[in-house]
Amino acid sequence: MNKYFTCYVVASLFFSGCTVQHNLINETQSQIVQGHNQVIHQYFDEKNTSGVLVIQTDKKINLYGNALSRANTEYVPASTFKMLNALIGLENQKTDINEIFKWKGEKRSFTTWEKDMTLGEAMKLSAVPVYQELARRIGLDLMQKEVERIDFGNAEIGQQVDNFWLIGPLKVTPIQEVEFVSQLAHTQLPFSEKVQANVKNMLLLEENNGYKIFGKTGWAMDIKPQVGWLTGWVEQPDGKIVAFALNMEMRSEMPASIRNELLMKSLKQLNII
């Protein structure tokens, strides 16, 4: 994405103020500000990691965490790209929500992936082989055109269609991710409403006390340093949408649940849930 970014930095742990103009898919502009919350800063410190939580409400974006510069730094999207992969595949009729992707008995990275599953089931299990198969069906040329059409991250997918989101060259910033997922939450992406609704249904993580939390995790294990994501949105009881993108440095010994733990604690701290 072509972005104009200006920032004023004070000699402290935080940015004093920050504004951004964006050329988004729907030509909106977002204002980005530092969210002053030392508690969330400490949440990341306590896990001995660096990270940022980007929150978008309407056109206002707030940054929290102990490494705010990550918000405008590019990282491989890892399995958060499954959201766009599914949108492209469904829109172009390379699959449908009822198709069963067959497991052929091969050894997979996790035993939970060693079964037949639909695209939605594979989304919830983050089953990489299913989405690699979908990417191969889409093909390199169409995938490149669609990623460019959506203006996702640096829009570079290279010459191998089934791993560019895991090891590069595709990269995206947390700010770009939160803008993308906010448009998905509001059904504003340039895909059919039906396709967007189907993908949103795949992303429901939790429903409690009138709040719905949608999201997709990502963990880039094959790059150094490793990168973790949890990107999605909260639908509040009154229907208001609050989008989020958590991005952090991961280590092999960390539990996968650390991303959800940090997100949920932070959302509660901010009175979003």
Curated annotation (Swiss-Prot):
Domain of life here? Bacteria
The chain residues annotated with the modification N6-carboxylysine are 82
Q: Name one GO molecular function term.
A: beta-lactamase activity
Note the topology in the membrane. Answer: Lipid-anchor
Q: Name one GO cellular component term.
A: plasma membrane
Please provide the Gene Ontology terms (biological process) for this protein.
cell wall organization; response to antibiotic
Binding, substrate:
216-218
Q: Which reaction does it catalyse?
A: a beta-lactam + H2O = a substituted beta-amino acid
Q: What does this protein do?
A: Catalyzes the hydrolysis of beta-lactam antibiotics.
List the protein's name: Beta-lactamase OXA-133
